[in-house]
Swiss-Prot record:
Annotated spans, Disordered: 1413-1446, 1518-1558
This protein's domain notes: Composed of an N-terminal active core containing the motor domain (MD) and a neck coil (NC), a central regulatory center containing the FHA domain and coiled coils (CC1 and CC2) and required for dimerization and activation, and a cargo-recognition region containing a coiled coil (CC3), an undefined region (UDR) and the C-terminal PH domain.
Name assigned to this protein: Kinesin-like protein KIF1A
Top-level class of the enzyme under EC nomenclature: isomerase
Organism annotation: Homo sapiens
Listed result of changing residue 220 to I: No effect on microtubule motility
Phenotype when changing residue 380 to W: In NESCAVS; uncertain significance
Result for mutant: residue 251 to R: In KAND; affects subcellular location; contrary to wild-type, does not accumulate in the distal tips of differentiated SH-SY5Y cells, but localizes closer to the cell body in transfected cells; complete loss of motility, when tested in vitro
InterPro entries registered for this protein in UniProt: FHA_dom, FHA_KIF1A, Kinesin-like, Kinesin-like_KIF1-typ, Kinesin_assoc, Kinesin_motor_CS, Kinesin_motor_dom, Kinesin_motor_dom_sf
Length: 1690
């Protein structure tokens, strides 16, 4: 056995004409035996390299030293294979590659010198070596067969008798072979050359008749080379038989790259079947011969699919069998063929791994003949045994006869044959035996045939072949042989043209003098030129050749009637004189070129300078000419065909859609019926209640107001409807993104919420059709769900409606379907041009909106000039820069100031303010004004609903602020009712310059823009009145570099207005809107996989890495928790949880294991554990003592999800979850701590997890992570609460001494703490106790909507999105935050304008209206954005002795609640805070008085009224501090809220008894771990004073909002106390400090305790105030600055 791998060579050819016309670039590089290919679509990608046995560079000319010629290819491959053949091995060479890559050139070559391919050179070299042999004892014989495999059919190219398709059979001894394939004996190279030429002619004739192309068929040229050696001494002759298979494979191109359709597509499918099977065979053989599988036993799955195609079946021995095989892969160098070339390289790379086991075929005949004779004997015995012996005798007689005698014998013995058939039918298996017998005897006869008989048979076949060609009119040589590549010198003739260049000009037909007839073989008269195939008539045409007086012969073509004959593309119906070079097409597939040598010679003599044609006159030229002359527009035909296909597709899609819709309706009806059954089963009482008639309830006027308020609220409620839109359309968004990624469109789609506000007005195309109808009745701005389209290619952002997305998605699907039929290169070419027809792109403007700014005009009422510096705010609430604008009143003839060279002077614009138009604008934008004036509650100002408990307490700041057109208008400080009362009187006397009917002129000057990012270039600004959309004033664009001085516009615009009531109202309340635009020149959009869920989070790369929050580990003993739907939140508690892992010590005690706290983040730490020691887990819960939270028992403690990474895949089922045995649980009572402590302990055997991570010593720098979940039952709760924590652990050996970390050493060194107090990990949690939602409540009914979240549905191509998901509920919460930010920015601008105007009036020593006085401003500030209209005294101050009426008390209480919500917008228990403040701080004041270090202050107490100036000081003045006592219900959905809080203030036992007797409602617990903020606002030491304590305590405080973490010292690593700043009230009073003589102090009040804190200095105290409550600190600093300015004026 001789094992050797397949020799693989690759060869790259030069560019062809098509590639040169398209300016193709070379993507192939060769160095030695290495071939490298470059991806033209991604040049930056690393080139792919392949290593082969030979890499032939034939891309350049022969002058190149690296050029590989035909000779070199043969020397490397052909000579080696020929040597193997002489050694007795089977040999195979096959060429592979796409059509036109140069396979046939490499294998066959051309007739010119040095252009012959491997086959001719190998045949010539074969006979050269035979002739050079001088050994008389050696004799050689060569036999040749030539076949073609086309569409899985085999044709014999050498024997004209074998016209049909030959059968491929398999013999148990010979293997696969072609039955009746002629093997012709040859004695010289000329014989082989003639046979190859004859075979190519036969191939050409057959291909032309059948309208085929050689590139779609495989050609196999077999040489059977026999060597006989006679040993004179022993008189024994030995033989070596070698089979040389030379294969020219069909093209490997894809159907889409050739445009194949119909029959061509079928042919391509069959070709690709052969090549695909060949690829499978090569891959399977390479897999078997690869390293890992080479020494393994052959499995049943190691199947080689040889039989899947004829080609691989016949080449079975050559592929991995008894053969020496070489493969030549032909490559195209052009970039347009990159995909096919890369496929060829990979094909060849797999082939080189195949190993063949070749053996020397020595003396095969003797053994073969013996085995065949044995088989014949066995088969005969079988037939005799079945009584069919006479059949064999008759068969032998028929086989031995000549063809003529056989026919006569058959005719004479018809009766006997029929009887034989009858006998065969009744003898099972006999027909197959006879067939095999015939087959075997035929092979025996072929093997026993002598060499002389083979030569005689070869000669007979040659004569038959030449006679057949002569009958067809093919020109012959004088000796009778066929003409090869030969051109007559005088006689006119026709040469064939073929699609395959190697088959063109292969057949030559003489046109004799006189008449030459062309037609079919079965014509009435004998035809001189015989053609066949479709559209060829029996008598097709006549060529008439006449000689005129010795001059050249004139050839005339006369078509017969009805025959399709074309000359130079024009159909010929009358005799036509032919000229040399004319193209003649007969029928549909026969293409010829007419050559007239004499005529051509005379033409050259007459016009010696005749130009050569620009392109070769070949088959393609003739076909193109035919289409042009016949007026056939292929493009139009293709479009028509495409239109028909589209219509058919549309019809079928409509039918499918209709059927799908019917099916959907059917399913929906079934689901609805099932849903009704479920509803009737689970909510029977709801249906019964609904069916019962309800009695009409008599409501009071107040109750009617509340009902009307609730109706309006729920009518415009949008939270759930927006969520339904997000859920229902998520699948469309995901599909659009998937198609965009697959088509490489560089466009991202994501949901976005848009609200119609001043900073973000909605464009008309985004408003739904019903927007105009409900605009007048809608009290709140409309919020819509839109799609944000981020065009990364052009750096543009567009907004689409959901309807537009669905429409575009249909077009995207059609584009995706069409993309499968278009080559990828064409798609990318089209992608470079953004056209209006692409559904992914929209037209984008050059300028993009940077942001908007607003300038109020109330200074024109006085009039004083003002210069504003206003913020430029984007639609997302981001401050993009600042704009300086000056507004002043001028006289009509006043000239503009001189600003130097940068002046932009505009003329005076005349604008009219129509009262009716402005009133319409006000009614459309602020429809709630009318309701407000009729006494409607201000609760109607709420915009954003649905934050659960927040809705129960009262309107939040974001709810009020978001309403940009409210009853008490949002301008607040500019237009509240109290200011109107103060303004109207003085203004009526002072508005001489604004008399009705007069012309008033004022000037708006756009001065400068600053702090605008450099990503916006060419900045310009335009401004207009807010209710006018038809015209705007614009500045000139300025270049923006982001550096240097501000951009100076200095644009002056004078505006003249006829004074009307609407104009005066406008400048009192409305601003001018300034819009800043710029050209955006960066593309900052991230890829889809980087899409963040919340744009508000800080970038995590700047902060330490934190562990992700895991979901609870599922319980093993408890039944599946069916969480009921939570209703309104009842209360919330902050939990501080300690986790300890205790290990068994030598003395029998369990000591907490050491915890490494390095990392600096709270609630983190690594347990350092010993291997193989018993352990216990201790969990301690700490929280404030409250009546609602009572722990009952620990139901289960489970641990699982053992891993070595912080992240975990929670979707997988963990088999190693372990439920721990609870050893103890209960309350503990540490000394000097009034908080509640609940502790439980469980035994943990880590070996029970059966995890290697827990059983072994942890490798260096690796950590083990585990998740713990505790299920704790609480009283009055429907289900257990779950506390979940991720542990980080490192296991050391049992006897290892753990080195204490730096933090632990510092802790021990201080001596202030025991080691056990630091060996714990903390966690901060929020416990929410919610009521169980009523099944029949509107909230439950809304939650039971059948709207499915489609974001989880699978979409084809979703895996390419790399984890991207559509935005969902979090988008609504983020948008609320954005709306609040926009509202706050708007309020800041109003307040800044108000303060600027007041300061301007004071500095100008003008009388300041009472509405702008400092005392009045304090009153306004205390009310936030809405103030009550309180009666004023003559001096303009509120009378402290005057009793407020009911409405005023309601407004005062509402203001208190609004202010507490403003400072702590997440705080939901403001009514409790008031009572807690009083009780706890009163206790603190008593403690202060008892402290001997404090001076006695008599009966002075620290009351909430004195320590909470933010609540009451602003409303009632600094001189009379008292707590408001509301005596009526507030305008709130819970009218008993505040009176109940007042009653709680009284420490009455009766009150407590009543509380105990109240029936306890079941609650739903929910515990969420709080993610610790990485941002430290402030840290340092503070002194604490709590009630019932002896004195001040010094603690280390770290503020990470919204929590403040308390430590015993700065060395302490364990959190001892946490303070939730979001629910705490921070209070500060200078008077209280002076009274108690405790400087630098402030108070923090929670629901359960009050704490007094003292800082080291005044500056330190203000820093702490800013860290605890930035808004309060800002208020204090503002008051201090006003106080200092007032003192300076005094």
């Amino acid at each position: 056995m001789a094992g050797a791998s397949v020799k693989v060579a690759v060869r790259v050819r030069p560019f062809n004409s098509r590639e040169m016309s398209r300016d193709s670039k070379c993507i192939i590089q060769m160095s030695g035996s290495t071939t490298t290919i470059v991806n033209p679509k991604q040049p930056k990608e690393t080139p792919k390299s392949f290593s082969f046995d030979y890499s032939y560079w034939s891309h350049t000319s022969p002058e190149d030293i690296n050029y590989a010629s035909q000779k070199q290819v043969y020397r490397d491959i052909g000579e080696e294979m020929l040597q193997h053949a002489f050694e007795g091995y089977n040999v195979c060479i096959f060429a592979y590659g796409q059509t036109g890559a140069g396979k046939s050139y490499t294998m066959m070559g051309k007739q010119e010198k040095d252009q012959q391919g491997i086959i001719p050179q190998l045949c010539e070299d074969l006979f050269s070596r035979i002739n050079d042999t001088t050994n008389d004892n050696m004799s050689y014989s060569v036999e040749v067969s030539y076949m073609e495999i086309y569409c899985e059919r085999v044709r014999d190219l050498l024997n004209p008798k074998n016209k049909g398709n030959l059968r491929v059979r398999e013999h148990p001894l010979l293997g696969p072979y072609v039955e009746d394939l002629s093997k012709l004996a040859v004695t010289s190279y000329n014989d082989i050359q003639d046979l190859m030429d004859s075979g190519n002619k036969a191939r050409t004739v057959a291909a032309t008749n059948m309208n085929e192309t050689s590139s779609r068929s495989h050609a196999v040229f077999n040489i059977i080379f026999t060597q006989k050696r006679h040993d004179a001494e022993t008189n024994i002759t030995t033989e070596k038989v070698s089979k040389i298979s030379l294969v020219d494979l069909a093209g490997s191109e894809r159907a889409d790259s050739t445009g194949a359709k119909g029959t061509r597509l079928k042919e391509g499918a069959n070709i690709n079947k052969s090549l695909t099977t060949l690829g499978k065979v090569i891959s399977a053989l390479a897999e078997m011969d690869s390293g890992p599988n080479k020494n393994k036993k052959k499995k049943k799955t190691d199947f080689i699919p040889y039989r899947d195609s004829v080609l691989t079946w016949l080449l079975r021995e050559n592929l991995g069998g008894n053969s020496r095989t070489a493969m030549v892969a032909a490559l195209s160098p052009a970039d347009i063929n990159y995909d096919e070339t890369l496929s060829t390289l990979r094909y060849a790379d797999r082939a080189k791994q195949i190993r063949c086991n070749a053996v020397i075929n020595e003396d095969p005949n003797n053994k073969l003949i013996r085995e065949l004779k044995d088989e014949v004997t066995r088969l005969r015995d079988l037939l005799y045994a079945q009584g069919l012996g006479d059949i064999t005798d008759m068969t032998n007689a028929l086989v031995g006869m000549s063809p003529s005698s056989s026919l006569s014998a058959l005719s004479s013995r018809a009766a006997s044959v029929s009887s034989l058939h009858e006998r065969i039918l009744f003898a099972p298996g006999s027909e197959e035996a006879i067939e095999r017998l015939k087959e075997t005897e035929k092979i025996i006869a072929e093997l026993n045939e002598t060499w002389e008989e083979k030569l005689r048979r070869t000669e007979a076949i040659r004569m038959e072949r030449e006679a057949l060609l002569a009958e067809m009119g093919v020109a012959m040589r004088e000796d009778g042989g066929t003409l090869g590549v030969f051109s007559p010198k005088k006689t006119p003739h026709l040469v064939n043209l073929n699609e395959d260049p190697l088959m063109s000009e292969c057949l030559l037909y003489y046109i004799k003098d006189g008449i030459t007839r062309v037609g079919r073989e079965d014509g009435e008269r004998r035809q001189d030129i015989v053609l066949s195939g479709h559209f060829i008539k029996e008598e097709h045409c006549v060529f008439r050749s006449d000689s005129r007086g010795g001059s050249e012969a004139v050839v005339t073509l006369e078509p017969c009637e009805g025959a399709d004959t074309y000359v130079n593309g024009k159909k010929v119906t009358e005799p036509s004189i032919l000229r040399s070079g004319n193209r003649i097409i007969m029928g549909k597939s026969h293409v010829f070129r007419f050559n007239h040598p004499e005529q051509a010679r005379q033409e050259r003599e007459r016009t010696p300078c005749a130009e050569t044609p620009a392109e070769p006159v070949d088959w393609a030229f003739a076909q193109r000419e035919l289409l042009e002359k016949q007026g056939i527009d292929m493009k139009q035909e293709m479009e028509q065909r495409l239109q028909e296909l589209e219509d058919q597709y549309r019809r079928e899609r409509e039918e499918a859609t209709y059927l799908l819709e019917q099916q959907r309706l059917d399913y929906e009806s079934k689901l609805e019926a099932l849903q009704k059954q479920m509803d009737s089963r689970y909510y029977p009482e709801v249906n019964e209640e609904e069916e019962e008639p309800e009695d009409e309830v008599q409501w009071t006027e107040r109750e009617c107001e509340l009902a009307l308020w609730a109706f309006r609220k729920w009518k415009w409620y949008q939270f759930t409807s927006l969520r339904d839109l997000l859920w229902g359309n998520a699948i469309f968004l995901k599909e659009a993104n998937a198609i965009s990624v697959e088509l490489k469109k560089k466009v991202q789609f994501q949901f976005v919420l848009l609200t119609d506000t001043l900073y973000s007005p909605l464009p008309p195309d985004l408003l739904p059709p019903e927007a105009a109808k409900d605009r007048e009745t809608r009290p709140f701005p409309r919020t819509i769900v839109a799609v944000e389209v981020q065009d990364q290619k052009n750096g543009a952002t567009h907004y689409w409606t959901l309807e537009k997305l669905r429409q575009r998605l249909d077009l995207m699907r059609e584009m995706y379907d069409r993309a499968a039929e278009v080559p990828s290169s064409v798609i990318e070419d089209c992608d470079n041009v953004v056209t209006g027809g692409d559904p992914f792109y929209d037209r984008f403007p050059w300028f993009r909106l940077v942001g908007r700014a607003f300038v109020y005009l109330s200074n024109l009422l006085y009039p004083v000039p003002l210069v504003h510096r206003v913020a430029i705010v984007s639609e997302k609430g981001e401050v993009k820069g600042f704009l300086r604008v000056a507004v002043q009143a001028i006289s009509a003839d006043e000239e503009a100031p001189d600003y130097g060279s940068g002046v932009r002077q505009s003329g005076t614009a005349k604008i009219s303010f129509d009262d009716q138009h402005f009133e319409k604008f006000q009614s459309e934008s602020c429809p709630v004004v009318g309701m407000s004036r009729s006494g409607t509650s201000q609760e109607e100002l709420r915009i954003v609903e649905g934050q659960g408990q927040g809705a129960d307490v009262g309107p939040s700041a974001d709810e009020v602020n978001n309403n940009t057109c409210s009853a008490v208008p949002p301008e607040g400080l500019l237009l509240d009712s109290s200011e109107k009362a103060a303004l109207d009187g003085p203004l009526d006397a002072a508005l001489d310059h604004l008399r009705l009917g007069n012309t008033f002129t004022f000037r708006v000057t756009v001065l400068q823009a600053s702090s605008i990012s450099a990503e916006y270039a060419d900045i310009f600004c335009q401004f207009n009145f807010i209710h006018r959309h038809d015209e705007a004033f614009s500045t000139e664009p300025l270049k923006n570099t982001g550096r240097g001085p501000p951009l100076g516009f200095y644009h002056v615009q004078n505006i003249a207005v006829e004074v009307t009531k609407s104009f005066i109202e406008y400048i009192k309340s409305q601003p001018i809107v300034f819009e800043v635009f710029g050209h955006y020149q960066q593309h900052p959009f991230p890829p889809l996989c980087k899409d963040v869920l919340s744009p508000l989070r800080p970038s995590r790369r700047h902060f330490p890495r934190v562990m992700p929050l895991s979901k609870p580990v599922p319980a093993t003993k408890l039944s599946t928790l069916t969480r009921p739907c939570p209703g309104p939140c009842h209360c919330k508690y902050d939990l501080l949880v300690y986790f300890e892992i205790c290990e068994l010590e030598a003395n029998g005690d369990y000591i907490p294991a050491v915890v490494d706290h390095r990392g600096g983040m709270p609630c983190m730490g690594t347990f350092l554990l010993h291997q193989g020691i018993q352990r216990r887990i201790t969990v301690t819960l700490l929280h404030e003592t409250g009546s609602h939270i009572r722990w009952k028992e620990v139901r289960e403690l489970v641990v699982g999800r053992i891993r070595n990474t912080p992240e975990t895949d929670e979707s997988l089922i963990d088999p190693n979850i372990l439920s721990l045995n609870i050893l103890s649980s209960g309350y503990i009572h540490p000394a000097q701590d009034d908080r509640t402590f609940y502790q439980f302990e469980a035994a943990w055997d880590s070996s029970m997890h059966n995890s290697l991570l827990l059983n072994r010593v942890t490798p260096y720098r690796e950590k083990i992570y585990m998740t713990l979940s505790a299920y704790i039952e609480m009283e009055n709760c429907t289900q257990p609460a779950v506390v979940t924590k991720d542990f980080c652990m490192v296991f050391y050996s049992r006897d290892a001494k753990l080195p204490a970390s730096r933090s632990i050493r510092n802790l021990f060194g201080s001596g202030s703490l025991r080691a056990s107090e630091s060996n714990r990990v903390t966690g901060v949690y929020e416990l929410s106790l919610c009521h169980v939602a009523d099944a029949g409540s509107p909230g439950m009914q809304r939650r039971r909507r059948r709207v499915l979240d489609t974001s989880v549905a699978y979409v084809r191509g979703e895996e390419n999105l790399a984890g991207w998901r559509p935005r969902s509920d979090s988008l609504i919460l983020d948008h609320q935050w954005e709306l609040e930010k926009l509202s706050l920015l708007q309020e800041v601008e109003k307040t800044r304008h108000y303060l600027l105007l007041r300061e301007k009036l004071e500095t100008a020593q003008r009388p300041v209206p009472e509405a702008l006085s400092p005392a009045f401003s304090e009153d306004s500030e205390s009310h936030g954005s809405s103030s009550a209209s309180s009666p004023l005294s003559a001096e303009g101050r509120p009378s402290p002795l005057e009793a407020p009426n009911e409405r005023q008390r309601e407004l005062a209480v509402k203001c208190l609640r609004l202010l507490t919500h403003t400072f702590n917008r997440e705080y939901t228990h403001s009514h409790v805070c008031v009572s807690a403040s009083e009780s706890k701080l009163s206790e603190m004041s008593v403690t202060l008085l008892r402290d001997p270090s404090m001076s006695p202050l008599g009966v002075a107490t620290l009351t909430p009224s004195s320590t909470c100036p933010s609540l009451v000081e602003g409303r009632y003045g600094a001189t009379d501090l008292r707590t408001p006592q509301p005596c009526s219900r507030p305008a709130s959905p819970e009218p008993e809220l505040l009176p109940e809080a007042d009653s709680k203030k009284l420490p009455s036992p009766a009150r407590a008894t009543e509380t105990d007797k109240e029936p306890q409602r079941l609650l739903v617990p929910d515990i969420q771990e709080i993610r610790v903020s990485p941002i430290v606002s402030k840290k340092g030491y503070l002194h604490f004073l709590e009630p019932h304590t002896s004195g001040w305590a010094r603690r280390f405080v770290v503020v990470r909002r919204p929590y403040a973490y308390m430590y015993n010292s700065d060395k302490d690593t364990v959190e001892r106390f946490v303070l939730n700043l979001a629910t705490a009230q921070v209070e500060y009073s200078e008077d209280q400090q002076a009274m108690l003589k405790t400087p630098n102090t402030f108070a923090v009040c929670t629901e359960h305790r009050g704490i007094l804190l003292q800082a080291a200095s005044d500056k330190d105290m203000h820093d702490w105030l800013y860290a605890f409550n930035p808004l309060l600190a800002g208020t204090i600093r503002s008051k201090l600055s006003r106080r200092r300015s007032a003192q300076m004026r005094v």
